Amino acid sequence: MRFHTLLFLSFLLLVSCALICTAQHPGLKKSGMFHENVGKGQHIEKKRSCIERMQTCEVEAGLPCCSGAPCICPYIGDCICIQ
């Protein structure tokens, strides 16, 4: 009986940690918001198109980012253009 209680509490702790992490790091969620990206001295409005963390966006993959330039998505935050 104690084993089952300990197992259940461990599961609850794991789920709560995952929920807290997701709430504190909105960059891990899919984002469809527009924002400004500074590139070569001008402001370019773009849409975040990297879907998963550490995913590389390529024009061939149908995931344009930074006006069609390749980019990398960090764990937290916006896409980083490779120019």
Curated annotation (Swiss-Prot):
MF terms in GO: ion channel regulator activity; toxin activity
Alphabetically ordered keywords of this record: Disulfide bond, Ion channel impairing toxin, Knottin, Secreted, Signal, Toxin
Q: Which GO terms describe its cellular component?
A: extracellular region
What is the annotated localization of this protein? Secreted
Describe tissue expression.
Answer: Expressed by the venom gland.
Which residues get removed as pro-piece?
24-48
Q: According to the UniProt record, which cysteines are disulfide-bonded? A: C50-C66, C57-C71, C65-C81
| Family the entry assigns | Belongs to the neurotoxin 07 (Beta/delta-agtx) family. 03 (aga-4) subfamily. JZTX sub-subfamily.
Q: What is known of its domains?
A: The presence of a 'disulfide through disulfide knot' structurally defines this protein as a knottin.
Specify the protein name: U25-theraphotoxin-Cg1a
**Lineage of producing organism:** Eukaryota, Metazoa, Ecdysozoa, Arthropoda, Chelicerata
